Regions:
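Inter-lobe connector of SF1/SF2 helicase motors
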Residues: 1-97
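Short glycine/proline-rich turn/loop motifs
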Residues: 26, 99-116
Length: 173
């Protein structure tokens, strides 16, 4: 087990999740109509996501950036017939990681790819980089597991940025 400090972005997301939950619990306790079921039922998942990587949330792709991505996406001939409003709605429910990975898939959207710093902006990724450097210095290899394919998708991009060769296996492989 390796202890990892969260980055400031992770700490903020973690704190926000706790604050949302406290507010929802106070609202429920005060007898207010419960709009907070989503907040209270997903708090543990939000905390896990915050502890893993900030790109598991949508905070960098605001509405303006999603609109620009959708407009560029339909510039590709294979997507020219798609409905712009439907794309905006579809993109709005995706995470920053998913949207950046989508942007990587076409030269029309490549300008929307998040920079390496955003992919590396996780305490766990920084600890993993240090461990990889140590393992490689010894001439050894490593095996990385995650319960979330979305985390593995992020790690693949991070490994690419670190220029670490890898083979990925998921339940979809």
């Amino acid at each position: 087990v390796e202890y990892c400090d969260m980055t400031p972005a992770q700490s903020q997301l973690y704190s926000d999740a706790i604050s949302r939950t406290r507010a929802a619990l106070r609202s429920d306790a005060a007898g207010a109509p419960s709009r907070s079921d989503r907040d209270t039922s997903n708090v543990l998942m939000d905390l896990r996501k915050a502890a893993n990587h900030p790109l598991l949330f949508r905070r960098l792709f605001d509405e303006k950036r999603i609109n620009a991505l959708a407009r560029d996406y339909i510039r590709a001939p294979e997507h020219a017939e798609e409905n712009l409003q439907h794309l905006r709605e579809d993109f709005a429910i995706n995470t920053d990681a998913e949207l950046s990975l989508l942007a990587r898939s076409s030269p029309y959207t490549a300008k929307h790819v998040l920079p390496a710093e955003e992919w590396m902006n996780s305490g766990k990724v920084q600890a993993l980089k240090r461990l990889i450097d140590e393992v490689r210095a010894r001439g050894e290899r490593m095996l990385i597991f995650s319960q979330f394919t979305s985390v593995l998708d992020i790690l693949c991009v991070c490994l690419d940025h670190m220029q670490v060769p890898y083979v990925g296996f998921t339940g979809q492989t």
